[in-house]
Design a protein with these regions (language model features):
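PLP-dependent enzyme catalytic core of the Aspartate aminotransferase-like
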Residues: 358, 362-393
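Conserved active-site segment immediately N-terminal to the catalytic lysine
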Residues: 204-216
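Conserved PLP-dependent catalytic core of the aminotransferase class-I/II
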Residues: 31-35, 278-312, 343
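Conserved N-terminal alpha-helix of the aminotransferase class I/II PLP-enzyme fold
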Residues: 8-54, 80-86
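Active-site C-terminal subdomain of aminotransferase-like
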Residues: 1, 216-299
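Active-site phosphate-binding strand-loop segment of PLP-dependent enzymes
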Residues: 103-121, 150-195
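Conserved PLP-binding catalytic core of the aspartate aminotransferase-like
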Residues: 310-347
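Conserved PLP-anchoring active-site segment centered on the Schiff-base-forming lysine
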Residues: 63-79
Length: 393
């Protein structure tokens, strides 16, 4: 975190129902729209909550039980979209990917209306919220909702994807996804929580209807604020929707956002920090911010070339590098990725990001976002080399 941003966090929290705070919030919205390349008529709303809050809000404000969604599930956060659909009873099919594998045309082809992903479409049409959706779906043993029929005969209305599946470090091909959604007239919802600012994002060009991000990744702020950016047609759809939620009803956020406010008390301090951070990015330039992160990622990946790790992602984001240890312990057992995290934390004062679930012992992740330098990269590499010399890798 930048020192200037940290100092703002130490200041007293002001009362927020004021013209001054409203002006700050409207600037936050304007800059978020600009950095997402959202286009004319786009709106950004800010929720006090985690990225998961924004994921759930997006799904329940855009879709109902009369829709059928396609969900890319390549890891923990794709599975989170699946779980949201299950909880709210929204029919879905999931495209399951092996950890570390990229999304390809072959994965999408069975779900295409025409079965042909090779032709460009001139625009994205409104699919309608209840077009030709079956209601005889059942749930198989895996928890996946399915009608039991060939997926190519189903009428899908929406597509949910984490553009960067943070748990495995895979960045999906947005050009491919964009083309598929246009050809099949799907509402496109994108979680860009860990990708925003680290990788190029072209909301309007790609026909993304809604994109969400959080304060704690490349914005390098405390966790607690989620931003949801909607294009013009999504704003209209949200305003016409009926949502059975008080806190997650985005209609209220849109209405209050017109005057630079939120319907409920927000994390005021983080929003003030966000304002200065967005201004700093504007001063540096969006491309400059992205290039800095990219350079850090490339520098780290070059420096670890001789260490006993494998980069497990087929399609990397600049935000992080997912590493699988390839070494063996003295007893012949594989080196634990989680144990590497613990040793770095406890003995070297360095934090990398561990994984959970079945990847906990197999993969850890090194981030390149936030207030980091090439010297920080070198410090981590030196620690890993020392661990290697100690026989810990």
């Amino acid at each position: 975190m930048e020192e200037e941003i940290r100092k703002i966090g130490a200041e007293e929290i002001p009362y927020f129902r004021t013209p001054e705070f409203s002006a700050l919030m409207k600037e936050n919205e304007s800059l978020m729209n600009r950095f997402m390349k959202a286009g004319e008529g786009a709106r950004t709303v800010f929720l006090t909550g985690s990225g998961t809050a924004a994921m759930e809000a997006a799904v329940i404000n855009l879709f109902t039980k009369q829709d059928r969604l396609l969900v890319v599930n390549g890891g923990s956060f794709g599975a989170r979209f699946v779980r949201i659909c299950q909880i709210h009873g929204i029919p879905y099919d999931e495209i399951r990917l092996e950890a570390g594998k990229k999304l390809t045309k072959a994965h999408l082809a069975p779900y295409a209306i025409s079965g042909d992903l090779g032709q460009e479409d001139s625009g994205q049409e409104d699919s309608g919220q209840g077009d030709s959706v079956r209601e005889d779906s059942c749930q198989d043993d895996s928890g996946r909702k399915s009608s039991g029929q060939d997926p190519s005969t189903q009428r899908y209305t929406g597509f949910l994807v984490n553009v960067h599946e943070t748990s495995t470090g895979v960045r999906y091909d947005m050009e491919l996804i964009s083309r598929f959604c246009r050809e099949n007239r799907l509402w496109l919802v994108v979680d860009a929580i860990s990708s925003f600012l680290a990788d190029e994002f072209l909301m309007e060009k790609w026909g993304v209807d809604l994109v969400l991000t959080g304060s704690q990744k490349a914005l390098a702020l405390p966790p607690g604020i989620a931003a949801i950016v909607m294009n013009e047609r999504t704003v209209k759809r949200v305003e016409e929707s009926r949502v059975e939620s008080l806190y997650f009803n985005l209609k209220d956020y849109l209405k209050d956002g017109e005057r630079g406010q939120t319907p409920f008390t927000p994390a005021v301090g983080i929003l003030i920090q966000m304002n200065r951070r967005l201004q700093m990015i504007e001063e540096k330039g969006l491309v400059g911010e992205q290039e800095q992160i990219k350079e850090l990622a490339e520098d780290f990946r070059q420096k670890i070339g001789e260490l006993p790790f494998q980069i497990v992602s087929e399609s990397l984001s600049a935000a992080e590098t997912p590493l699988a240890p390839t070494g063996k312990n003295a007893d012949g057992s594989p080196v634990s990725a989680y144990r590497i995290f613990e040793i770095l934390k406890d003995e070297y004062g360095i934090f990398v990001c561990p994984n959970g679930g079945e990847l906990a012992e197999k993969v850890f992740r090194v981030g390149h976002i936030g207030h980091l330098t090439k010297e920080d990269n070198q410090k981590l590499v030196d620690a890993l080399r020392d661990m290697q010399d100690r026989g810990l890798l």
